[in-house]
Amino acid sequence: MLNAARGLAIRLSTRRALSYSGPCCAAKTSNIAEYKVVDHAFDAVVVGAGGAGLRAAMGLSEGGLKTAVITKLFPTRSHTVAAQGGVNAALGNMNPDDWRWHFYDTVKGSDWLGDQDAIHYMTREAVRAVIELENYGMPFSRTADGKIYQRAFGGQSNDFGRGGQAHRTCCVADRTGHSMLHTLYGSSLQYNCQYFIEFFALDLIMDKGACVGVVAMDLEDGTIHRFRSKNTVLATGGYGRAFFSCTSAHTCTGDGTALATRAGIGNSDMEFVQFHPTGIYGAGCLITEGSRGEGGFLVNSKGERFMERYAPNAKDLASRDVVSRAMTVEIMEGRGVGPEKDHIYLQLHHLPVEQLLTRLPGISETAKIFAGVDVAKEPIPVIPTVHYNMGGVPTNYMGQVLKYTRAKGDQLVPGLYAAGEAAAHSVHGANRLGANSLLDLVIFGRACALSILKNTKPGETPPDLPANAGEASIANLDKMRHANGDIPTAELRLQMQKTMQKHAAVFRRGDILAEGVEKMKGLYKDLKHLKTTDRGLVWNSDLIETLELQNLMLNAMQTIVAAENRKESRGAHARDDFPNRIDEYDYSKPLEGQVKKPIDQHWRKHSIIYQEPETGKVTLDYRPVIDKTLDKSETDWVPPKVRSY
């Protein structure tokens, strides 16, 4: 059935009947004549087929637009499949709840770097999104009376932080992402959406500041495909593989943020990288926060539930940045576990076996395979592990990509949209709450579709491509395919990952970051000395990994340079040399009588990061955080204050 679906999706009858012999084939490379170019025209093109990409594609196709989905792997292998814990929505099935409480918790969780109009939109629409998923057939776990089961998750409260722990996270045991991805993909097949599976996106096609399409390579036969479209959605996921230890799949290489960079668009807030508290020690595999939501807790070598000291109210369900830092402090102060005292234990064996089997079957299996642990009898060795990128391509709350200048403020990039982990909407700010990521996918995937449908009629003639469209992409592809330097791709990638792991970790310091920046500059220069060995065009994994390394390098450079420049601690960005959050006001004192600092004198602002791909040079700018909500009558903004759990 899957093979048949794949054939229907990408074996278009005219696929090899088209060819192109214009300027694209005149690039100054040695073997350019080898590259056959196929042209397509669509109303909309979606790059990526995870949760955000599939939800965008469904909305576009349902609205009658001729839609293409370009994905470098089969849709159900997208990294959304690895999400475990759940999706947040204030259904109120376990206790009274209100989306405004969810709004408050998300703003607080972001350490007041989130844009409150986008957070308003996401949390208000969350209940509708979950009901929509249920209608699509997503098999949520149930309570005894048949309602959707909701578990406790970190950083979430009732009554604006005054009413104790909220149970807001809708789940499918501990395999929620797997269920969501299969549900969305299955539902998408009822629409007339064309999938280009195992196609690698090389570059956006830009013309006079507008995005008019995408250049991609078919991994199966090496043909180059130019997708001409008035609308392009980036939904390519994060770049966790820029680090040595992460919960991300090997395919999480920051392709979308790299595409934006090469198109001259600045990415936002790349310095904010979330370390999940509970990756399996030594393997990096994710152990869901839902394990603590179900009653698990962390212990040190003394057997202490140490989170009671760091977050007296929320304890083990404080926000992820707080828990990861607490674990790191315990290890640094000699209270870690194991022979090297370099990790922490997650205890679940006090929970009933029935609860482990029904609510946490996936992590029980994962712990057995990757840690050799029977969770019903012994604790799981865990350590903070790179998990999520809060930064990405900057957008407004409708998914439209923004280009910011101080003179003009936020300006739309015509024809370009982004959703999911590839985007910075910014609903997560400096730190994402657990289970807001799956919500982000469906909310902003849908928002992109709604925005496009407002501005595009089915069958509308797409814009013409510039004469040299794809020329630089093919030139770079050919250069990497015939790279004959002395550094194998895997070797340079490993050096980059270890540099990022060492110099941009849970705790950061100016001298360590500065050293990391210099190391990364040297590694970036080494891209010119790469060596590839496979010269073929058919299933050339050596070539694709090299192109992915180019993308990772862009993301890594932007992350570490922005981190070195941000001289404060906020959310996931914690600096030993600047331990305090630096806002426009001192919120530890009464606001009355205080004068707001200008934007150059505080750090409650979004970074905008431009990079020159040829040299690697990074340029930084900053834009204000949006504090206004969409409708003050629905909910007012949450003023910043000292953040504690």
From Swiss-Prot:
Broadest EC class assigned to this enzyme: oxidoreductase
Localization (cell): Mitochondrion inner membrane
Main location: mitochondrion
Active site feature: 320 (proton acceptor)
A GO MF term: succinate dehydrogenase (quinone) activity
Transit peptide interval: 1-25
Obligatory cofactor(s): FAD
Biological process annotations from GO: mitochondrial electron transport, succinate to ubiquinone; tricarboxylic acid cycle
Tissue expression: Not expressed in adults (at protein level). Expressed at very low level in adults (at protein level).
Membrane topology reported for the UniProt record: Peripheral membrane protein
Enzyme nomenclature, EC number: 1.3.5.1
Cellular component, GO, one term: mitochondrial inner membrane
Residue list for modification Tele-8alpha-FAD histidine: 79
UniProt entry keywords in alphabetical sequence: Electron transport, FAD, Flavoprotein, Membrane, Mitochondrion, Mitochondrion inner membrane, Oxidoreductase, Transit peptide, Transport, Tricarboxylic acid cycle, Ubiquinone
Cofactor binding description: Binds 1 FAD covalently per subunit.
Pathways involved: Carbohydrate metabolism; tricarboxylic acid cycle; fumarate from succinate (eukaryal route): step 1/1
Family: Belongs to the FAD-dependent oxidoreductase 2 family. FRD/SDH subfamily.
Known function: Flavoprotein (Fp) subunit of the mitochondrial electron transport chain complex II which, together with the iron-sulfur protein (Ip) subunit forms the catalytic core of the complex. During the free-living larvae stages, which occur in an aerobic environment, complex II acts as a succinate dehydrogenase by transferring electrons from succinate to ubiquinone.
Subunit: Component of the mitochondrial electron transport chain complex II composed of four subunits: a flavoprotein (Fp), an iron-sulfur protein (Ip), and a large cytochrome b (CybL) subunit and a small cytochrome b (CybS) subunit. There are 2 developmental stage-specific forms of complex II which have the Ip and CybL subunits in common. Complex II from the free-living larvae (aerobic environment) acts as a succinate dehydrogenase and is composed of the common subunit Ip and CybL and the stage specific subunits FpL and CybSL.
Protein name (Swiss-Prot/TrEMBL): Succinate dehydrogenase [ubiquinone] flavoprotein subunit 2, mitochondrial
